[in-house]
Amino acid sequence: MNMLESNILELVKDCRLIGISGHENPDGDCVGSCCAMAMYLRKAMPDAEIRVYLEEFDEALVRCIPGAESVRHDLPESGEVFDAFIALDSTPDRMGPVSHFFDSASVKINIDHHVTNSGCGTYNYINGKASSACELVYELMDPDQIDAGIAQALYTGIVTDTGVFQYPSTGEKTMCAAGHLMRYGFDFSAIIREVFFERTPVNARMLGTALLKSQFLEDGRFMLCVLNREDMAAYGAGRRDLDGISAQMVLTKGVDCAVFAHEDEAGVWRASMRSIGIVDVARTASLLGGGGHVRAAGCTIRTSITEALGILKKDIEEQLRSADGHELR
């Protein structure tokens, strides 16, 4: 694996068409890192064409991340070849159809902080101990070339993936980066409020529904909720109206691990997992082809939801009981 050590601009200085993308169902870190990188490259390479491709994302991110309004939600034209393609906060198998254009690019750059990523680019910058992709992108940038827009995009991503600096991956480097970015004068408190704490009425109702329908397993240490399309249709909810539910579930007293699964479309389910101490949810998610971090992970389920939940429950229960010194029956 070629580790990215030089200035990223050196790797793409001769490129005329550069693509940027991240994982499916993009969150603030994914959108923030992609938009910040695009602004940075456009500033340094005004003659190059820089395109960001992502699935649609929360409107709050459009309002809080400069450049998010120009992200493309379509795909490049068939047969189009990029001089360079940058995969941020992701690996190609989590990028959806756009991964083909990453694979065919002359220069492939992968920047990620997920522990399950071993690097998939011509050049890679992978650090599973970093708080966010935005923290890694910040490390690769020339501080003198960061402006207010880039700073706000990076800060928003860091805030999102650290849960406002509360998750264990938050470190000294994270706080130093955030402190430097705050010097650019954007309204950081408004970003935290809008991106992390505010809920729409539909989101609030779906959170209430999820909490009411949750099961408590393993003496209350494992909280599980499954919502189908009928549950969502009752309030006209879409995927974006379910943001933050697993993070709220794991805050319940006595809970170490929370799993929230919802039916995204007929036969396709998405599971979001959170842990605070014992359970390695990245390990659990990997059993179904997903990934993430020790304390936050997820997966897409295209097989029987009953069988998939059985696999997840068995692994989580096994981890909890192993910590107690008991074998899983």
Set out the residue ranges of the language-model regions.
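Solvent-exposed alpha-helices and their adjacent loops that cap or buttress functional pockets
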Residues: 77-80, 100-103, 117-118, 146-147, ...
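Active-site cofactor/cluster-binding pocket
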Residues: 70-123
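Glycine-rich, phosphate-binding/catalytic loops in enzymes
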Residues: 37-38, 102-105, 126-127, 176
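Hydrophobic helix-and-loop "lid/oligomerization" segment in the mid-to-C-terminal part
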Residues: 2-24, 32-63, 73, 77-82, ...
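Short, hinge-like loop/turn segments at secondary-structure boundaries
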Residues: 67-71, 104, 126-129, 276-277
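Short glycine-/acidic-enriched loop or helix-start segments at secondary-structure transitions
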Residues: 30-31, 62, 95-98, 120, ...
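Polar, low-complexity loop segments and adjacent catalytic/binding residues used for recognizing
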Residues: 27
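Short alpha-helices
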Residues: 111-177
